[in-house]
Amino acid sequence: MNELLVEFLGGFTKTNQWSAILPEIMLGVLALALLGAEMALPKNKQTLIPRLAIWGQVIVLLVVIGCIVWCNVGESEYFSGLIIQNDITQIMRAFFLVSSILVCYLGQIYLSKQSLPKTEFYALVLIIAAAMMLLVQSANFVMLFVALETVTVAFYVLVAYSRTSQFSLESGLKYLILGALSSGILLFGIVLLYGIAGNPELMGSSRDSLNYNELAKFITLNTNNLVGVDNMIVKIGTLLVVAGICFKIGAVPFQIWVPDVYQGAPTPVTAVSYTHLTLPTTWL
């Protein structure tokens, strides 16, 4: 058992790419630990769960801060260009952890006055924080879509978390429908851009046609070569990607759903929705 543990921890070295996302892995493990603690602890010890969630995130935050202070990250690519880390992304990771800690604290106060499941709330907040930390590091449309959809699916549950409230259930249903619509629009735009940029004769077989930088270079260098249908596909694909992201963050003119969803969602959920989705996605 000890040998397996040493071998596992030994994998998180500076040369191993998994060490780059160690804070996100720690949040995922912590979320699973909370669910396991709920089953293992007696009812009179359930109050330890929110403390475990908060202090666990504090430990992860210290790891991120230590990386900011002592590690010279520079501009580093991991997982074949799926994510890029630099000083700004490290600061954004710390921002998500701080806001997630505050949301868990607000959630503890809110849930103490409600007869609602508590552990699942903290686990979902941790998953959202981990996904958003990956989102701001994404350099590829695959990572962008997977991380963004992980956040969105978790929000589907959190918006309708107050299941005894008609307004909360209504908000959850509206968010589910509009979220699915925005995901479809975003994915369709990504497919169109990949379809035109994935041509090896234009892009080159060694380049990643879903990478932001490579795609931008392709469009810039081939502006004069893309005529007729190809040029129209690029424009439509770009428009759909922008529209899908604007739907997600509630930007004008796609903000109609925001008042209804925020009105019915629990207060901590509204806080986590704005801090974890709107502001960082706008920055991205």
Locate each region found by the language model.
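Single conserved hydrophobic/aromatic residue that forms the stacking wall/gate
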Residues: 276-284
